[in-house]
Amino acid sequence: DQPISIAIDSSGIKVSNSGDWIRKKWKVKKGYLKIHLAVDPSSKECVSIEVTKEDVHDNKEFKPLLEDAMSKNHVERAYGDGAYDARANFNLLDANGIDAAIKVRKNAVPKARGSYTRKLAVMEQQKDFDTWKKEKRYGDRWSVEGAFSCIKRIFGEYVSAKKFVNMAKEMTMKASLYNLFIRMTMGRG
């Protein structure tokens, strides 16, 4: 198998298609779902998906997404924004021999505190962020944003199901159909 990179991010999906004025009038808060994706930047396909409720932080889903992606593919690099800047994530990537292309927070301190890999990433990014971006091909992270955009444009920004289990199944099905469309347009399907 060819090694792949993955870009990880999350986005919100409305649980209702009713207008915002209904929520305002009746003071009903419907909330939203969070869809967490790992996308292969070269093929643009969703490699892994997790669906959670709105109160789950992106960082908590990094490990399940990565492990699911590793079970199906040989992952060589993982992209993530500042929400995934955690020592545990850097350690997980290092333990599996995966190159970390995670943007650290602006106020990050270059101290190891249990993660030498993160310390090196902080020092590298603080020294020259533009060079780091080019070396890591950090722009490839946008492939996951493109996947969210396509899924929302094709299938809508909401789910039709009422129960959480069925909402998760619906979003997984939408991601699978998105992959099918990508394969068809790229001539692989």
Which residue stretches match the model-derived regions?
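Helix-centered, glycine/charged polyanion-binding patches within enzymatic domains
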Residues: G82-R153
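Basic, amphipathic alpha-helical segments enriched in Lys/Arg and hydrophobic/aromatic residues
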Residues: D130-G189
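Intrinsically disordered and other compositionally biased segments
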Residues: G31, N107, A121-M123, Y178, ...
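Short, charged/polar low-complexity linear motifs in solvent-exposed/disordered segments
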Residues: P64-E67, R113, M167-K169, Y178
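Polybasic low-complexity intrinsically disordered regions
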Residues: D1-D99, V104-R105, A175
